[in-house]
Amino acid sequence: MLVLTTLLAAAAVARENAVQELAPTGKLRVALVFAPEKSIFFVVKDANGKPHGVTADIAGALANKLHLPLEYVLFPNSGLATDAVESGAVDVSFMPVDEERKKRVAFGPSYVLGESTYMVIAALPARTVEEVDRAGVRVIGIANTTTIRAAIRTLKNASISSVASVAEAVAMLLDGKADAFALSRDSLPTYVKQVPGSRITYGAFQQIGIAIAVAKGKPAALAAVTEFIDDAKKNGAVRKALDDAGFADIAVAPMTPMTQ
């Protein structure tokens, strides 16, 4: 009995230490990325500025599990969210994983897998990812994201430039200032409706996991969020977040994500 009591006490102390390391201010500050429409990654803001979407729901579940008040901190792109996690301005975020980001933040498991492709205007005859890569084609992507880094790596002939947000990218397509927009496939159907004659290309130039992230040098915090995401994938919480956001056709990431 004494041994069991000692073990339980030690486990309680370890949990308390993990929570303190993860959320030193006493509240869980979560960086989310907003856009005009929801995706498996982006949230939308209501009239009061409150975020809604997959990552907002998962963040809420994490705060509930840790018994912490929740503070959402919203950014227009994942590059700024990465900066906030790295600097300690926020405690946790969710973002696509690539080698560049792994140098800056620590990733737990992916909750979902996605792929990146292009949305092209009507005047561009390209039907596939490969056909976008032609001299004279103007491609745009969101600054400091895994998607634009992958597009830069794979494009050999087309030109590519960055914008600060999805809204700015759509405006450039409408104004004829760009021919193609690089983004996650699940995000694009809504924006195709906003740009007459536009379409989504076949194929993908990137397949990637979207994962929970914390600052480097916080092993207890990383272990805590890893356990949470693994449990959320097993108990249906991630599935529910996807379904509630309108992504019933998107699969939950397997327990051994390809990006980890």
Name each model-derived stretch.
Residues 37, 60, 64, 69-133, ...:
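Acidic, polar ligand-binding/catalytic clefts
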Residues 26-34, 52, 130-147, 159:
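Short loop->beta-strand "edge-of-pocket" segments that line small-molecule binding or catalytic clefts
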Residues 19, 53-65, 124, 130-133, ...:
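Extended ligand-binding regions for polar small-molecule ligands
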Residues 79, 95-104, 150, 174-206:
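A ligand-binding cleft/hinge motif common to bilobed small-molecule-binding domains
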Residues 15-96, 235, 244:
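Extracytoplasmic small-molecule ligand-binding "clamshell" domains
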Residues 28-29, 67-69, 86-95, 136-138, ...:
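Alpha-to-beta junction loops
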Residues 112-122, 185, 189-230, 248-260:
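Periplasmic-binding protein-like
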Residues 56, 72-83, 127, 161-175, ...:
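Short helix-initiation/N-cap motifs at beta->coil->alpha
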